[in-house]
């Protein structure tokens, strides 16, 4: 493929919510940041403003409030006007239908077969819970990333605040192009306000993805701010 330009996406998981702490499956329910989540977002913003993960030119986010509130704090730390933060439904968590709002403690009793099928994840088109399939989620998130890469100049670095399940999808997309790198990053361990970097190379025939960094929480450790791993509230629908 003939290279045209590269864009880096600095991928950020939102701060913690009360539902994360309680182990409640969130999906597209609009849970708010709790006190720990605010502290995580502020520590993340400070790390980005200090250049720890390189420069940031643009901030974009899922429109769910746990993500957008994190993004606004990041933008403020970077002296980027919050009015320029691009919010989109395409970066939302996967909609998991009737599983949303159910605690992991209870879900195996209240929705046993649905939960087990969802957890098994063997059918990427399955949406028996009444929400989105894995492929639905993939299509919208990957499309947004590639469209955004095409619309920005070479060398642009975009901070993207999104969700654990969406990050899972984006890591899977990287693994399609870079299978040898697959085992170098634990895609299932993505803590609140962790940092990853994905580089998309736009060519004349498509886009090539590469995972540069994944799930970095060193900035939170140094700020003495704890964080919960994705999956605490229920895998792809729990972030």
Model-derived segments and spans:
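Beta-strand elements within well-structured catalytic alpha/beta cores of enzymes
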Residues: 8-12, 60, 86, 156-162
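Phosphate-coordination/substrate-recognition cap region in phosphate-metabolizing enzymes
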Residues: 3-4, 44-116, 187-191, 196
């Amino acid at each position: 493929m003939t290279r045209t330009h590269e864009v880096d996406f600095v991928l950020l998981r939102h701060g913690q919510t009360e539902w994360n702490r309680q182990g409640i499956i969130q999906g597209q329910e609009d849970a708010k940041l709790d006190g720990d989540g605010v502290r995580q977002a502020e520590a993340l913003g400070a790390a980005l403003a200090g250049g720890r993960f390189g420069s940031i030119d643009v901030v974009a986010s899922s429109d769910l409030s746990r993500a957008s509130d994190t993004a606004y704090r990041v933008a403020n730390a970077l002296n980027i006007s919050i009015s320029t933060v691009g919010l989109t439904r395409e970066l939302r968590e996967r909609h998991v239908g009737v599983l949303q709002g159910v605690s992991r403690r209870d879900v195996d009793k209240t929705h046993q077969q649905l939960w087990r099928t969802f957890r098994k994840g063997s059918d990427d088109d399955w949406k028996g819970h009444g929400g989105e399939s894995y492929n639905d989620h993939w299509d919208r998130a990957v499309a947004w990333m590639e469209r955004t890469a095409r619309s920005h100049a070479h060398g642009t670095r975009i901070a993207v605040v999104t969700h654990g399940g969406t990050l899972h999808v984006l890591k899977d997309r990287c693994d399609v192009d870079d299978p040898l790198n697959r085992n170098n990053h634990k895609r299932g361990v993505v803590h609140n306000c962790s940092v990853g970097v994905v580089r998309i190379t736009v060519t004349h025939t498509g886009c090539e993805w590469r995972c540069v960094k994944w799930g970095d929480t060193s900035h939170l450790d140094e700020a003495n701010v704890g964080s919960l791993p994705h999956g605490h509230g229920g895998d792809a629908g729990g972030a």
